[in-house]
């Protein structure tokens, strides 16, 4: 039986996506490797580490720590990644089996099949605090990523989830926050209708999130 090629997240910790990106050092030709996991439903960073090497062993250890931290140990979870060596390593695949995680991989020759992780890395590398000259040490890189992750999860108002933070959506706080925001906008429109040319912004909570939904069209 052919395994499914698209998955839908109705709540947090159902579908994760992950990738590895290079972080430059101040030494020419030397890089650090950022492993990072994002929850598709909430956009929360659910796991991350920075290492000096790229390996399936480091990835497997990160996955175990992440599911323990998020409290989804042995619960059904899909983990999407591209087709890199670390992502398809036997060590990682064995760990995913142990953790009851279903592996999903990008289609060959499709560049945007891991779009959520790619978008996260673009945000990371274009924030004003990004050290364009590189990181001096591994500890410097880890410290910077720690600060970025706290900002991204708890302060960054994400356009893809109605401008709440990933942490708020992950904890289920977005419904109340968006209802309050909708009420505020409607009151403002009622008080000054001349300032509004149409309906207020849609503040309904973002619904389910589907991984690569265009695949469904191809299968139809």
Language-model-derived ranges and their functions:
Residues 1-220:
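Charged DNA-binding/catalytic regions of mobile-element recombinases
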């Amino acid at each position: 039986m052919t395994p499914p090629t698209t998955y839908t997240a109705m709540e947090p910790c159902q579908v994760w996506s992950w990738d590895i990106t290079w972080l430059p050092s101040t030494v020419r030709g030397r890089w650090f490797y950022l492993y990072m996991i994002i929850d598709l439903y909430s956009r929360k960073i659910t796991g991350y580490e920075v290492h000096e090497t790229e390996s399936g062993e480091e990835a497997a250890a990160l996955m175990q720590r992440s599911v323990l931290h998020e409290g989804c140990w042995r619960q059904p979870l899909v983990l999407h990644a591209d087709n890199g060596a670390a992502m398809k390593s036997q060590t990682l695949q064995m760990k995913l089996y142990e953790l009851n995680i279903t592996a999903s991989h990008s289609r060959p020759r499709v560049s945007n099949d891991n779009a959520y992780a790619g978008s996260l890395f673009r945000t990371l590398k274009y924030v004003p605090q990004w050290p364009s000259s590189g990181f001096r040490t591994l500890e410097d890189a880890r410290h910077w990523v720690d600060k970025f992750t706290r900002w991204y999860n708890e302060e960054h108002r994400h356009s893809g989830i109605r401008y709440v933070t990933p942490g708020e959506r992950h904890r289920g706080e977005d419904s109340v926050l968006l209802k309050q925001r909708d009420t505020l906008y409607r009151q403002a429109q009622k008080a000054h209708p001349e300032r509004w040319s149409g309906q207020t912004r849609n503040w309904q909570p973002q619904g389910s999130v589907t991984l690569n939904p265009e695949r469904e069209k191809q299968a139809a």
